[in-house]
Amino acid sequence: MNPEQFQTALAEKGIELSDTQLKQFHDYFEMLVEWNEKMNLTAITDEKEVYLKHFYDSISAAFYVDFTKFDTICDVGAGAGFPSLPIKICFPHLEVSIVDSLKKRMTFLDALAEKLGLTDVHFYHDRAETFGQNKAHREKYDLVTARAVARMSVLSELCMPLVKKGGSFLVMKAAQAEQELQTAEKAIKLFGGKVEEHFAFSLPVEESERNIYVITKTKETPNKYPRKPGTPNKLPIE
C-alpha cells in the first residue's frame, strides 16, 4: 500500500487526509526507518508495508469506533507509537498519553512528536502495572488502547484500571482472538469490563485477519489491580 493508495483507502472509509496530515505520515515513515537503524523499533521498514501494517492497521479502529466522541486516550505498550499516533494524526483533537517501559522508545517518540508538530501528546516511561496504580492516571481515560502486546487476560489487567467508568478499552488483535477472549472473560469481568462489540475484518492487500474488541467499563476496578510488575504476565487471571 503506497501513500496514494493509503490516502484513497482512508477516504473510502470517510477519513479525508489534508496535505499536512499526509506530510506527517511521510515524515513519520522516514523517521521510523532512520531511527530504526540505531534502535530496534520495528521489523517492518519497507514503505508499502509500513503504510499498510502500521499506519492503516492502526487507523482501522476508527472504521468501527467513533473517535470524535473521545477526548483522552491512553496507549499501553505503544512501541513506536502504534496505534495511537496514527490515530492522533487523523483526529488532532485527541489528547494522547503513551506508556512504555523502554526509555529509548520514549526518546524516539519525543523527537517524533516534535518533528510532526503534534500537541497534547504525553509520553510516560513506566511499567503499565505501576502506571495503573498512579492516582493521576487511574480511571482517568475515555479510551485505552493496546495493539497485540500481550494476551487479552494480561492486557485487561494492565489497561482496564486506566479506563474511566463509562469509558472503553479497545483491544486490537490478529488471529486466534476468539480463543483469547474466552480465556480472558473472567479477568475482563473482574476488572469491571463488559465486552460490548467485536469487529472482524481483513487487512487489504494481504488479506490477513484482524479483530477489534470494544470493552466498556461498567464498574471500578478493585484497588489491588494491577498487581506488581511482572505478576500479570506470570500469573494471568484466567
Curated annotation (Swiss-Prot):
S-adenosyl-L-methionine binds at residues 77, 82, 128-129, 147. GO terms for cellular component: cytosol. It holds the Pfam family GidB. It comes from Listeria monocytogenes serotype 4b (strain F2365). Specifically methylates the N7 position of guanine in position 535 of 16S rRNA. PANTHER family: S-ADENOSYL-L-METHIONINE-DEPENDENT METHYLTRANSFERASES SUPERFAMILY PROTEIN. This is Ribosomal RNA small subunit methyltransferase G. It is an enzyme of class 2 (transferase). Its EC number is 2.1.1.-. NCBIfam families: rsmG_gidB. Disulfide bonds: none annotated. InterPro entries: rRNA_ssu_MeTfrase_G, SAM-dependent_MTases_sf. Its main location: cytoplasm. Belongs to the methyltransferase superfamily. RNA methyltransferase RsmG family. One of its GO terms (molecular function) is rRNA (guanine-N7-)-methyltransferase activity. Transmembrane segments: none annotated. It is found in: Cytoplasm. Keywords: Cytoplasm, Methyltransferase, rRNA processing, S-adenosyl-L-methionine, Transferase. The keyword Cytoplasm applies.
